Amino acid sequence: MACENNLVVKQIMDLYNQISNLESLKPSKNVDTLFRQLVSTCLPTDTNIDVTEIHDEKVKDMRSHLIKLCGEAEGYLEQHFSAILGSFEDNPLNHLHIFPYYNNYLKLGKLEFDLLSQHTTHVPTKVAFIGSGPMPLTSIVLAKFHLPNTTFHNFDIDSHANTLASNLVSRDSDLSKRMIFHTTDVLNAKEGLDQYDVVFLAALVGMDKESKVKAIEHLEKHMAPGAVVMLRSAHGLRAFLYPIVDSCDLKGFEVLTIYHPSDDVVNSVVIARKLGGSNGARGSQIGRCVVMPCNCSKVHAILNNRGMEKNLIEEYSAIE
């Protein structure tokens, strides 16, 4: 259980206090240093801290606010580098390495592609990314290195973010044709989501539990049966940086895998399939969710409404 007296939590709270007192979260030497320190403090996976078991209200409030500050700073960082990349006279995609977290996106994209390949029998023709932002690196990495014939539809509520993002791919002969940008609040749209084989939900869409669950419920209502949703989550100390998506939040979906990286890729990955299609029929009676401990990681048991049959969902960690 995490509390104020825990040394690591104290360090996180100290960094939170410094960050929350900054005049601006836009990239600067001070901002960059503080967030680097925060990330390095939260990266270790050899910890018994489970933020879902926190009962200290001060720590809980701090975590909620810190996640929002991290999201705001990440948005500014992406805007900053997207504008720089867009100013290159040649193809901006040739210079993606200048973005400080580009290697993380390469690793995350490979991880998500591998997980997707394990649970799908065909290559997706159309993918939606909700909350793509000014620097849609997940879509770019997947399109460029893993899904060369797939069309990516990127949705963001911010028109300026989409302008910056579309400029990044506008001089690439391939991606300029396969990356499409939509300025809309897709979570208010009732049509269109059923045309995608795979839907990605960005970590920054739904920064608190209530809004994250609301976004998931909207996807469940409007995605095609059998389509796959991929979400970003967090585990251990990393949940001080990003919201957690629990399998219990995914009502109407069959959760296939929850993967917790142990390297410098911060986000956990959750992959689930919309029930109702041929693949999801066996999970149509899913009711409540129970977490069961195991020696190497954790296994989620999904019980049906009668509490009799069990379907095991794979949840594994790279710490083994």
UniProtKB/Swiss-Prot annotation:
Catalysis: reaction(s): 3 S-adenosyl-L-methionine = nicotianamine + 3 S-methyl-5'-thioadenosine + 3 H(+)
UniProt superkingdom: Eukaryota
Key words of the record: S-adenosyl-L-methionine, Transferase
E.C. numbers: 2.5.1.43
Cross-referenced InterPro entries: Nicotian_synth, SAM-dependent_MTases_sf
Matches recorded under PROSITE patterns: NAS (PS51142)
Pfam families in alphabetical order: NAS
Broad enzyme group: transferase
Entry's Gene Ontology BP terms: nicotianamine biosynthetic process; phloem transport; pollen development; pollen tube growth; response to zinc ion
GO terms assigned for molecular function: nicotianamine synthase activity
Function (record text): Synthesizes nicotianamine, a polyamine which serves as a sensor for the physiological iron status within the plant, and/or might be involved in the transport of iron.
Family statement drawn from the similarity comment of this UniProt entry: Belongs to the nicotianamine synthase (NAS)-like family.
Protein name as it appears in the record: Nicotianamine synthase 2
The encoding gene: NAS2
